[in-house]
Amino acid sequence: MSDGRVNADPQQEENMVKPPVKRSLTLLIVTYFFLFFGSIASSLLAKYYFVYGGSSRWVSTWVQSAGFPLLLILIYFPHYVLKTTTRRPFTRFTLRHLIFSVLIGLVLGFNNFLFSWGTSYLPVSTSSLLLSTQLVFTLILSRIIVKQKITFSNLNCVVLLTLSSVLLALDSSKDKPSGLTKTKYFIGYVSTIGAGLLFALYLPVTEKLYRTVYCYAMVMEVQLVMEFAATVFATIGMACEGGFKEMVKEANHVFTKGPTFYWTFAILANVVTWQLSFAATSGMVYLTSGITGGICMTALLAMNVIGGVVAYGDVFGGVKIVSTVLCIWGFSSYTYGMYMKMKKEEKEKGEYSGVKTTEDSGEMEVEMGNVKDDVAAADDRA
């Protein structure tokens, strides 16, 4: 870990070169693809654990962050195996980065715990629609923390998605699973809203932190520390509940699908897909902005609703249909507004802005400033 001193010439770090636009857009598209797959798969697998006999919210919390060692591949392979960069891992990773990453990671761990409570009681479709309320908090907190401009485009999107959740709340009595008490349903409802609030805080705070990093690899390093802290939080909770011995007992005697399905799908697949989702979220926030990342995730919640209906037979009545349409409408209007503003700005500039570069040990590192600056600018002016 660096002591914070920078060896490269500061003037070199401000150099701009003509952009490899396709590379920038490709990274953004690939990141969203992994977010798409990871978000939907992790939500369905999280419910899979509870549907077939799993009962520990701490286990459900633990699997959401325990896959952090997978990030070591993205961090170490480029330098030591692929030899595509001379930048050593954790170069310029300062004490400030470490402290903030740990603190954010602990908040993320508690967020995961609240999500687990909500998932254990609510249908996938219901919890997904409730989580869309995070956009209200994300917009407000982004305005406070990173000075995000409130425009017609993002405000319209937030209003539509919030209305979607309000409609769902008014129809909640018809959505309560049979055998579930009103108290437990209320706990699940409040826990899910709380998880949305904390995740809304997570997005702009990480955006502010990512403004102090200079390449995509550093984003993964910050994410590694965050997920490690979240895993420590969950592991302590598991230890108080019986630890891994309880997992073995649950796999062999409680889980109705048997130990093979327990370890393969309820645990391993959950670990991988959750890590994919969180890593892609971080990449999306870094390349664009916290509010854009939140809107992209919220758009996927509509797919989670459909996934819950298909995979678990969740009730999909008129209110949920309207709520889902509002989610899609809100995201589509925001995306279109952002796209039109980007085209207008590109036309005014006459060409794409440059890709910011830095130099480390004589070799150039490319930071995806092109996409980040263009999308953020469009978001501010949409």
Swiss-Prot record:
Residue intervals passing through the bilayer: 25-45, 62-82, 98-118, 121-141, 150-170, 185-205, 224-244, 260-280, 291-311, 315-335
SUPFAM superfamilies: Multidrug resistance efflux transporter EmrE
Subcellular location: Membrane
Keyword Transport attached: yes
Keywords: Membrane, Transmembrane, Transmembrane helix, Transport
GO annotations of cellular component type: membrane
Membrane topology designation: Multi-pass membrane protein
Region of interest called Disordered, as start-end residue ranges on this chain: 345-364
GO biological process: purine nucleobase transport
InterPro entries linked to this entry: PUP_plant
GO MF annotation, one: purine nucleobase transmembrane transporter activity
Protein family membership: Belongs to the purine permeases (TC 2.A.7.14) family.
Protein name, UniProt field: Probable purine permease 4
Gene: PUP4
